[in-house]
């Protein structure tokens, strides 16, 4: 869940909010969940063009904007909420403790990437 949230923030937040340069995952051609889901939704011709542009390092800001405005983002958010929900359910079996409370809060925070 943490990695998915980080991938979302790389596309959706500002550099001031995240404390890092945005779009670095795309610039480094990292296969993130948002990228994978977005590519799967594209027609084949557009998918090949996007992959070519990514591998050449061109049009990164445009591709980041396309991903962030696509239906893929809703899908990725849904997957993130699912993982956080699963984590919360697993925590119910643990005895009450400060660690359990901290993990529960972490799952809650991670489920809201913006």
Language model features with spans:
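All-alpha prenyltransferase/terpene-synthase fold signal
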Residues: 1-114
